[in-house]
């Protein structure tokens, strides 16, 4: 589930979809960890309740990696300022988040370990899709697609199926 976004919020008398996602062990929580779509305290709540079921996603749109300015999303003009994309009425319109930034944000904003945040971006999505036998971690017999991060969790190198890629 696309946790917190596009659904009823968590309320103590009506926990709704968020409450179900936090408590139902069958649910995977897709989380846009940019600090705009989901408040850091709400991200931390997900970690307390469902750390092993969080899947980091970006919800990135065409302005990702681009300078601030006007863009279109599904035919509607949107404005990006400071990396945050909004509609004319002020609503969020996708994100400009990268996966490595989501990993850094989880570590910085929620206190999870780098290994836990990396699993949220690699092993957990593979488990959610049922392909963790071939993807999501480095083990003999699995596909060797690897992202090398520095100590600050910034991308340094990428290998796709064992081949060094340029980026």
Swiss-Prot record:
UniProt cross-references to SUPFAM superfamilies, sorted A to Z: Metallo-dependent hydrolases
Catalytic reactions of this protein: N-acetyl-D-galactosamine 6-phosphate + H2O = D-galactosamine 6-phosphate + acetate
GO MF, one annotated term: N-acetylgalactosamine-6-phosphate deacetylase activity
Cross-referenced Pfam families: Amidohydro_1
Keywords linked to the UniProt accession: Carbohydrate metabolism, Hydrolase
EC annotation from Swiss-Prot or TrEMBL: 3.5.1.-
Family: Belongs to the metallo-dependent hydrolases superfamily. NagA family.
Protein name: Putative N-acetylgalactosamine-6-phosphate deacetylase
Lineage start: Bacteria, Pseudomonadati, Pseudomonadota, Gammaproteobacteria, Enterobacterales
